[in-house]
Amino acid sequence: QTTVIKPLVKQPTAFAIITDNQTYANTKDAMHQYKTAVEDDGLATYLISGDWQNPDQVKQIIIKTYQECPSLEGLVLIGDVPVALVRNAQHMTTAFKMNEKAFPWDQSSVPTDRFYDDLNLKFEFIRQDSVNHQHFYYKLTEDSPQRLNPTFYSARIKYPEKKEGDKYAAIASYLKKAAAAKADKHNQLDRVFSFNGASYNSDCLIVWMDDEKAYMENFPLAFGRQMGFKHWNFRMKHPMKYKLFSELQRKDLDLFMFHEHGMPTGQLINDELACTDFNNRYKPQIRN
């Protein structure tokens, strides 16, 4: 069963919150607080929940909503919304390359929400994962466009299962926090911090060259004050985590973004210390 709660107000553009019935039932108050906050931010907001059996069901409701409201510009997937793992598409990943024939499917396939937000791409369903029933394998077809051109922007709010704990309480807490932040009109988003961790995007600095343009477009107020925007790289210090801890404790900081590899309970900040000078290359060994 799918439930669609339509926007309460008319706006030039629209947004969709998509969740599963179980998550909605356990976070209902927080979900509606978040919906109201997004609408107050100027976006007509749909709240869609369903008992999703596969990604195609979710995609069909997205397409239907888009047909009814062509001004739909973005969406967020909250909770246990099925995940599409795509094969035959590694030529469109930034750095991930793994032999699909030599490695297990769950390792060599690419989990991506481009399945939902890029309606130009064509996929062929293969099968459901035998262990994680929320994972579904698809193939990017040969006659599909071979470049990304998303129809919407999208995000996913999902609690990592391996972290254990009450996932619904955590999601509800996050949504209430996000709603409160949107409601605070006096606290402008003018202090932003971005950090790039080790081994991300193949450690290629060229990849990040145009990042500042995107930051200036999305967070213009941060560039109107001294030190309003900081962009750090893991190469700046080893270890970096203690300096990051100091920044995270700043009361005035509005947004902190990590670009790095991670695990459910850990983040990969620094790489092994590079041998860039004499002291790094020659370390006397102390023997007992």
Per-range role (PLM):
Residues Q1-N288:
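Cysteine-dependent hydrolase recognition
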